[in-house]
């Protein structure tokens, strides 16, 4: 399990480094915004905005409401769609970006997913990457190696390269890169204010419209993984995996699509065999009503570890 602490996150979410936070704070008076831009961490920003809030939790909740209700952020769309638009537009250019091959390589096909590669992507992305960078000397050669695998860092390099090449669709490409950066910042901040952290892992999955998964841990060392997918052909699919005593697995599946439910039910034995082959003991796989998906994960004794957009 990869874990993070609030101490590692505090100085990452600043108006100067998180575009989503800067967008929300634009609604605040200009003189207050200038003051907030000099803040050292998210905690001091929240204290400055919400002096009457009794706890950090209330501060987070108020900023979370501002974030969720911001009209610009509500219309962002999915990262996956923005990335497809960018790569498609890039194909029409006569000249290639130096980083283009790296971007294509990052968008690996989910059919070829490898557990070791996925683990490496998680450990070297988002807040986990930023916490590693904080402990390195700025001249350390390892920094470039770490950044080469991070999608957000790749977007920054892409923007730098675009500014130096006379592409026909240069303005459109730069706008999409800015949108992608804003989308990633938005999900990171949204998850952080919900007592977690988020990252984006790029994968190609033609059947997928949008998707995310979050990993949580309760006070009894049980782990829960919520997988939320929007499939192009079948619509919404929610799966919750519960791991107990590090080896016993429960699986709950929920979908409003009857055809998808029937297909999944017909493949349950194969699914159980594949899960068992990993060394886990599958105790239960059940289908539940979509209206019953508000699990105990919303209780205070279960904390969000991290969230991943795919």
Show where each model-derived region lies.
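Extended non-catalytic alpha-helical interaction modules
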Residues: 1-236, 242-310
